[in-house]
């Protein structure tokens, strides 16, 4: 009879792919495949988005090195706080446009992923960040191509931010958090 510990040990050592509905690539060493994922989704110059607390951690440096080794140019944006704010999202959009990026790789916990998703929703939409506020009608966009190709790499467990298109962002004028969403702003993996 297998024990729960043995089942967990086996699961943690396997590479597994599934969808929820976002495709998920799970397993030890899967970060090594980032170059292949970028090639698959035609990302040649991603903006790496993380938070201030994670910018110096080994997994962020490893991600950047793996991209460089795969001949993929990238830039790091680490201006996301533990409670992402609208001004940080605007700064991320400026960095994305200025760097002529063609995709986003979000790495970190729920806040970093939410900040990156908000950047992805708004960077090419031609509208305001708050057009995507959950309680409002879904914005009509001229093209769904306005959403950059998006890869998430969660470094914590719990929020599930890597599997959904919503983002919790603080409105610095109102001093309140709002949920941003667009049904077609999907994470690619």
Where are the predicted features?
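An N-terminal, well-structured beta->alpha segment
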Residues: 1-77
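A glycine/threonine-rich phosphate-anchoring loop and its flanking beta-alpha core
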Residues: 125-187
